[in-house]
Amino acid sequence: MLQGPGSLLLLFLASHCCLGSARGLFLFGQPDFSYKRSNCKPIPANLQLCHGIEYQNMRLPNLLGHETMKEVLEQAGAWIPLVMKQCHPDTKKFLCSLFAPVCLDDLDETIQPCHSLCVQVKDRCAPVMSAFGFPWPDMLECDRFPQDNDLCIPLASSDHLLPATEEAPKVCEACKNKNDDDNDIMETLCKNDFALKIKVKEITYINRDTKIILETKSKTIYKLNGVSERDLKKSVLWLKDSLQCTCEEMNDINAPYLVMGQKQGGELVITSVKRWQKGQREFKRISRSIRKLQC
């Protein structure tokens, strides 16, 4: 679970809440790479961190000491936002080589990430983590991994076992920056069921979606249509299919947001999100539009 202010790892990414979950990963202390004999297990479809990796089987225990798939799933989700931040094209490869190390039937030895792979990812991603107050964890220090050889996972340029650099993920439709005029804003407000000014308390990932829990005392209601006060008391909004796209618009857990959306199947689904910046011309226009809203 991703916790509120002061602990987000890089939500759509990047904001303090995910790092709160990442802390759980660091509590294993120093990893011991001399594990008992590993077993090959199919990579589950709900291991979103390694979705699309080009091998089917992983070793348990893994290189982080997780002995059950439940542990892997609980800890891996916190790192998805770091991958989506695209601080390095091989971030997923590096993390998956630890969370879900490749398992080959004819090889008993666990294949670790190469030292150079770790160094490259650390050099690019550690500053991103540091910006949110979290240092690169000791358990991932690159000196723990072997120098480049045939029995370690190298950078994409020389590796054929794991996928090469992926295309940059698309921007989530709800998070696209649209330069709307007043009429466009009015139309957007009218076609949605709710418009709220919110602050985020907590964020979690469920399957392909993002569940956003609101700070109840920091919520301003601008419009409700078919949405009851009871619906809002749940203080839960959803950003659908968000693990397949990025949302840089929503990358600060401490910022207020204007969100609009629709009620779908009993859930409040976000269709538009904008960071609320007091005094910004666009939000003055939005405020005027809300005050004279007539749908």
From Swiss-Prot:
SUPFAM superfamilies in alphabetical order: Frizzled cysteine-rich domain, TIMP-like
Tissue specificity annotation: Expressed in adipose tissue, heart, brain, skeletal muscle, pancreas, thymus, prostate, testis, ovary, small intestine and colon. Highest levels in adipose tissue, small intestine and colon.
Signal peptide annotation: 1-24
CDD domains (UniProt xref): CRD_SFRP2 (cd07446), NTR_Sfrp1_like (cd03580)
Residue stretches in coiled coil: none
MF terms (GO), sorted A to Z: endopeptidase activator activity; fibronectin binding; integrin binding; receptor ligand activity; Wnt-protein binding
Transmembrane residue ranges: none
InterPro entries xref list: Frizzled/SFRP, Frizzled_dom, Frizzled_dom_sf, Netrin_domain, Netrin_module_non-TIMP, SFRP2_CRD, TIMP-like_OB-fold
Domain named FZ: residues: 35-155
Disulfide topology: C40-C103, C50-C96, C87-C125, C114-C152, C118-C142, C172-C245, C175-C247, C190-C295
Top-level taxon of origin: Eukaryota
GO BP terms: BMP signaling pathway; branching involved in blood vessel morphogenesis; canonical Wnt signaling pathway; cardiac left ventricle morphogenesis; cardiac muscle cell apoptotic process; cell-cell signaling; cellular response to X-ray; chondrocyte development
Ribosomal protein found in the keyword field: no
Ranges for domain NTR: 172-295
GO cellular component: collagen-containing extracellular matrix; extracellular space
Compartment(s) of residence: Secreted
Key words of the record: Developmental protein, Differentiation, Disulfide bond, Secreted, Signal, Wnt signaling pathway
Short name of any one Pfam family annotated for the protein: Fz
Major site of localization recorded for this protein: secreted
Entries under PROSITE patterns matching the protein: FZ (PS50038), NTR (PS50189)
Family recorded in the similarity comment: Belongs to the secreted frizzled-related protein (sFRP) family.
Role: Soluble frizzled-related proteins (sFRPS) function as modulators of Wnt signaling through direct interaction with Wnts. They have a role in regulating cell growth and differentiation in specific cell types. SFRP2 may be important for eye retinal development and for myogenesis.
UniProt note: domains: The FZ domain is involved in binding with Wnt ligands.
Stated name of the protein: Secreted frizzled-related protein 2
Organism of derivation: Homo sapiens (Human)
Gene: SFRP2
